[in-house]
A protein has these predicted regions:
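Amphipathic alpha-helical scaffolding segments comprising HEAT/armadillo-like alpha-solenoid repeats
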Residues: 99-113, 135-148, 169-181, 201-216, ...
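A short, charged, amphipathic alpha-helix used as a generic interaction element across diverse proteins
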Residues: 55-72, 431
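Extended alpha-helical scaffold segments
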Residues: 203-211, 217-405, 409-419, 423-428, ...
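Structural detector for internal amphipathic alpha-helices that build alpha-solenoid repeat scaffolds
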Residues: 121-134, 144-147, 155-169, 178, ...
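Short aromatic-glycine-(Arg/Gly/Cys) micro-motifs in beta-strand/loop hairpins
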Residues: 21-51
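Generic helix N-cap/helix-start motif at coil->alpha-helix transitions
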Residues: 106, 116-125, 150-159, 170, ...
Length: 521
């Protein structure tokens, strides 16, 4: 059997979104048939034939062309054409081009999604990729797949709902409404609905339907902006529904309570942390994602939680890698939040294996090693399940910029690199950020003297050294002198004293300078 020719047609008008496919097939030597398939986009298509018995090529070609022309005359368009569907009067969902100006990769993904699960075995990958890219052009195909999803197929629906959270418009809200009450998918549907509503409008109605029912126990305290009371209630109840409601509410008094729940969660409350971790990953909330990931990572490993703990370690890296591969603008904020969550005190004793390998101090922190050392030649990921990293017997070389995962994406966000320098508590992470920033002279010039002084005063020792390096390149000012005098970096003290010795008249004329020299470290 050989397909000689085929046509992929589709029709979109108002709420109608249909597909019609025609194939001219050679079933034997000089014997041909014309088959067709039709149905709503994304669903299993019905099939049929226009030739009950095989015919000659000339006759089959005539039947094929006639059927294609008939469908085109009825409003069908070629499947690879750029089409602006005609909206129905008053239709709020069809307000402009659906396929126009869509990136080529998104067009390929949409085409595969439109073929449905029966004809496209890579659908789960395409759904995840659509979620990562977050383009609205994928919404119609995702909705069709969701409508055709069996009530018992919660696993596939759990992939489609996050994709709609990033690709959906107001059209998706009505389709997600039925999932809000689902025991298995309700939390995902609530989160997706809130994300869409915040993006396209209608947050008040969606909040009342999806979030408010979960907050009855703390609503008076939220109304009073009493974060202390909210924390007390949330940590005493330790309810998944309440914690999810607080997180989705976005209320200023709610977030400290959610963080407190994560930090105080015991072995019996880990399901709450796992749910928050997934919601934070869906919303690309770097801070909460990192807090939950580190909490899971820091739990004492037992036979009951070891498998889940290792799974979440791998999932953290998988989330970051997908964002990086898509060149997503969310990669750098998520990665920065993860690196800010590690400290020098997280180091563990160095271990040596029987085959000469060395497990360094931060070997078990999969996300940390992935972000800083993914492209490093002398550091390797160990077994898949444990995800620990080890090095050869030659010792670990100094960190280089190209060793990190997606260095080009880091270079696009010097503000986050500077944040990592100022707020980081891990030498390796700060060293990486400083190395990346050194070549960005334009951004470094925009850093104020106050910021440099604060970093020299309160930053990590590595950050103080980096800030002092650039402070030296500037004209001395009382602000820089204040930071250098309070720094733990000895050369900074020497710099201030040497400048004062060379400019005694300036020091004598300024009470600020005298105070700095008297009170400085």
């Amino acid at each position: 059997m050989r397909i000689v020719d085929s046509a992929r047609l589709w029709f979109a008008e108002g709420n109608s979104d249909k597909v019609y496919e025609v194939d001219l097939v050679e079933v034997a030597t000089d014997q041909y048939v014309v088959n067709f398939r039709y149905g709503r986009r994304g669903t299993a298509l019905r099939d049929g034939t226009k030739t009950a018995n095989p015919v000659s090529l000339a006759k089959a070609r005539a039947v094929f062309e006639s059927l294609v022309q008939e469908k085109r005359a009825g409003g069908y368009r070629d499947g690879n054409a750029t089409v602006t569907p005609t909206p129905l009067a008053g239709d709020p969902y069809r307000t402009g081009p659906v396929v126009a100006a869509v990136p080529l990769e998104v067009q390929h993904i949409v085409r595969r999604l439109n073929q449905g699960r029966r004809r496209q075995p890579t659908i789960p990958y395409d759904v995840r990729r659509a979620e990562t890219l977050g383009h609205v052009a994928a919404e119609p195909a995702l909705l069709e797949l969701l409508r055709g999803c069996a009530a018992t197929d919660t696993a596939f629906a759990a992939q489609l709902i996050p994709a709609l959270a990033h690709c959906g418009t107001s059209r998706s809200l009505s389709n997600l409404a039925s999932y809000v009450v689902s025991p298995q998918l309700g939390t995902l549907a609530r989160c997706a609905s809130m994300m869409i509503a915040q993006r396209v409008g209608g947050s008040a109605d969606t909040y009342a339907r999806c979030v408010a029912p979960l907050l009855a126990a703390v609503q008076p305290s939220l109304d009073d902006d009493n974060s202390t009371a909210v924390i007390a209630i949330a940590t005493s109840v330790m309810s998944q529904a309440l914690t999810v409601g607080l997180y989705l509410s976005g209320h200023a008094a709610a977030r400290p309570a959610v963080i407190a729940v994560v930090r105080t969660a015991g072995p019996g409350d880990q399901h709450i942390v796992h749910v928050l971790y997934k919601l934070a990953g869906l919303q690309r909330d770097g801070e909460m994602f990192a807090i939950c990931a580190r909490h899971i990572d820091d739990q004492r490993s037992t036979k009951d939680n070891r498998s889940a703990q290792r799974y979440f370690r791998r999932r953290t890296v998988r989330t970051l890698r997908r964002l990086g591969n898509a060149a997503s603008r969310d990669f750098a904020p998520m990665a920065c939040a993860m690196l800010l969550a590690y400290r020098d005190s997280d180091a563990e004793p160095v271990r040596h294996g029987v085959f000469g390998e060395t497990w360094p101090a931060f070997a078990r922190y999969h996300a940390l090693n992935y972000l800083l050392h993914d492209n490093k030649d002398d550091l390797f990921r160990g077994a898949h399940d444990t995800s620990a990293w080890h090095q050869g017997g030659q010792g670990l070389s100094r960190i280089e910029l190209d060793d990190a995962a997606f260095p080009a994406l880091w270079k696009q966000r010097p503000d986050l690199l500077w944040r990592l320098v100022c707020g980081g508590q891990l030498h390796a992470a700060i060293d990486f950020a400083a190395l990346t920033l050194r070549s960005n002279t334009g951004f470094l010039a925009s850093i104020t003297d106050d910021e440099l002084a604060d970093t020299m005063t309160d930053g990590h020792r590595t950050a103080q050294k980096f800030a002092f390096e650039f402070a030296m390149q500037r004209a001395m000012s009382p602000t820089l002198a204040r930071g250098a005098a309070a720094s733990n970096h000895s050369p900074a003290h020497d710099w201030v004293v040497a400048w004062a010795a060379q400019h005694p008249s300036d020091v004598a004329a300024s009470g600020t300078w005298l105070a700095l020299l008297i009170t400085g470290n």
